[in-house]
């Protein structure tokens, strides 16, 4: 049968459930769709056609239109990392707007299980080794509502943990950026993280939350000075 239904006897949690689904999958691609989201009838066909056009790509993702050219557009690992870490960002999206080549997902080891930031971690792991395809927007609909996992992460400040993942990726031997680009990317991330922490502590008056994040991301009080430096 083309469609099979598998039920978990217990709630496995977000990422363990996705890993189990990937283990059951037999197809060339993985397409996750959370129960509160929607993919339009043409969406899957567009995603698959784009991935077939670029067989060396591990990840396809819906992105806003770009003046640089039409989609689908394929990016090298270096170009993808440069756009995310030195440009306006690239990997800040969830699985609803993504399609993954199954072989690459398995070679990368699947999701680590880090709550809230596991998607981002997987995207940069894939992008370090394989090409990435930009897809047009409008293929899916992502619903926001109270009680969903995304809102839980926002309210618990869990998404700040993406800083540690980004810093590890920039320091990894597999990072496709040059040494000069890595240095600039690290400076940018540190400055933004420092500004986020100060905003949380001062403007939002969440001192304890800011301190917990600083400890978890090994960001020392003196490191906050980087928030006042000019952009690299």
Regions from the PLM with identified roles:
Residues 34-38:
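The conserved acidic donor/metal-binding loop of glycosyltransferases
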Residues 30:
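Short aromatic/hydrophobic "clamp" motif used to bind/position activated sugar donors
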Residues 121, 144-232:
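C-terminal subregions of glycosyltransferases and related glycan-biosynthesis enzymes
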Residues 8, 57-64, 135, 142:
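Short glycine/serine/threonine-enriched helix-capping/active-site loop
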């Amino acid at each position: 049968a083309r469609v099979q239904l598998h039920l978990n006897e217990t709630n496995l949690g977000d990422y363990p459930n996705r890993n189990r689904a990937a283990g059951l999958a037999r197809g060339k691609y993985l397409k996750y769709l959370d129960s509160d989201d929607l993919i339009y009838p043409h969406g899957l066909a567009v995603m698959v056609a784009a991935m077939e056009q670029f067989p060396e790509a591990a990840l396809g993702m819906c992105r806003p239109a770009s003046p640089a050219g039409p989609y689908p557009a394929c990016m090298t690992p270096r170009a993808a990392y440069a756009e995310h870490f030195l440009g306006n960002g690239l990997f800040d999206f969830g699985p609803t707007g993504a399609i993954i080549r199954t072989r690459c997902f398995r070679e990368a080891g699947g999701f680590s299980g880090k709550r809230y930031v596991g998607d981002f971690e997987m995207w940069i792991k894939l992008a370090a080794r394989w090409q990435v395809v930009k897809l047009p927007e409008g293929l899916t609909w992502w619903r926001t509502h109270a009680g969903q996992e995304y809102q839980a992460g926002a309210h618990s400040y869990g998404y700040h943990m993406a800083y540690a993942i980004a810093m590890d990726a920039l320091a990894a031997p597999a990072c496709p950026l040059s040494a000069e680009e890595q240095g600039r990317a690290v400076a940018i991330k540190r400055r933004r993280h420092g500004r986020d922490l100060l905003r949380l502590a001062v403007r939002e008056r969440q001192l304890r939350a800011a301190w917990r994040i600083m400890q978890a991301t090994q960001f020392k009080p003196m490191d906050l000075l980087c928030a006042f430096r000019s952009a690299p």
